[in-house]
């Protein structure tokens, strides 16, 4: 009876026929087999039972089945294997006809139902494969070897891999490597329909090639690319280049061998079409780039990760008349970049023309020019909690951008002082709007901690900053040849500067370390510097700094400045400077030494800055107090032989008579108030 498929063994679930209440054989007992949930003793309920021979043949037997003295079921006195073709009930009786067991459905106890389990939808889960996983994990997986790939690291496997991808795209399957090394001579193109590409170990063979990209005619590619290793081998140009990719993850990849000019590890977006890349995540990748042969001068481009959206290309988005133009379609949208490690090259990450980009929790190191470059025309960016190490020129640069947040980053360098360009941990310029710099730690040999120009609506707060030139420097312009008085400015070439003024800058709650000037403000090139508030700053090492606050104006166009609650223990009055004294300020309050020291007057036209207490210290006649604030009141202490000249339009003294210090002039105090452009005497103590 070879046509029978009998795989259900007639047996106790414990595989031994024993008594119910003692571990003894059911000697000379009987077994009855019937339909599920019926009494098998009743002949109407019984089903056919077979003896399975050693050759796999089956012989039908009658019931009941006899149990021998040892507890084994026998046929014609011989121990045999009894089977059925279906699930069944089973009753076991002893030699005295007493029921010992009854099982309404033996299959519930899994005596032998592998074929049944294999026939279920989850059956593929039961079959394992090498090196790991099961058949069900790989039902929709294609390998390059299925299409002829050799994977020896020398033969060209491009066509086999491309054929595998084409097939997978057509059938909505995945392509997965087998652990071998695939050498390729041409760009592998992903196509719409492929679900993922993973575990490929690829080496580039052709000069300046792109290893992995997508079909030029496809947009809305949705494909996860993960756990791949790409070696550009010193000849390849780009590891991965995707555009028009959506809702995809690029993760756990490793890209090495990047040494050429204009090379990229992972790049999303190109400038030559309007394909939209959106809702993508780039995470937990490793990109190792070779050293920049030009040592961070910015003349080369070697990028680990790039997000390149469309932007107005003329002069970095600036027209020749200085206006910033936002006229390009948004092509790189909502990208999450996190957990990546990028080492070397010129820019660890570069992302112009992007919107809704989050760059967080990455480790970027040894970018010879910048760790993070968000210029040009990116908007709504978050740069947070990154570790930025040893950028040669600047750790973070953002230019011609709006609504960028730079928060909680650790920024350290021990090599930026050797580079002549930028030299700023965080640098911004080129018509910036809505920038927040908050809670960053900046240490090392930076010349500037935070350095910006051409900006509006900027907040710089709660940062810890260490630098050698200026911790926070805000300028209205950058010049290739700054005026001599702009002592903390650096030479910068800006061939097409924005026309915007620099205004609405809030600086608050920062901790100043290092030896550089803590706060530097510079108005240059006839551009206005306005509405800058500095408050609640803590300046360490104030006594050893060249300046705590330095304000320079080349065109008297700084206005609306304010200083308040500046704690600079150990500072002296000469640690503060303003070209026009109080003139550009709305208010100065509670600034260590600046608002508390008695300031000596030795010239005919002393510049008033900060303090309200001045002491005549020479016999030079005083003809004006320069640069007072409207409504400001000052006290002037006399000096033997010292003189204040009455001039009704400049200094108006009591009775229209000059003040001349007599023998007790050291005790004289005259109080003045500025109304309009005239100082009025309001009282004296003598």
Please provide the spans of the model-predicted regions:
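Exposed extracellular interaction/assembly regions and N-terminal maturation sites
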Residues: 126, 131-146, 589-652, 674-686
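Beta-solenoid repeat scaffold
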Residues: 174, 185-205, 214-227, 247, ...
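Fibrous stalk/shaft segments of extracellular and virion attachment machinery
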Residues: 107-159
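Consensus "Asn ladder" position of solenoid repeat domains
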Residues: 228, 253, 280, 285, ...
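Short glycine/acidic-rich loop motifs that flank beta-strands on beta-rich extracellular proteins
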Residues: 173, 184-187, 204-210, 230-241, ...
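Extracellular disulfide-bonded cysteine-rich modules/repeats
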Residues: 87-90, 666-675
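N-terminal extracellular ligand-recognition/capping segment immediately after the signal peptide
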Residues: 158, 162, 166-209, 581, ...
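N-terminal assembly/attachment segments of tailed bacteriophage virion structural proteins
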Residues: 1-113, 147-148, 155-173, 177-182
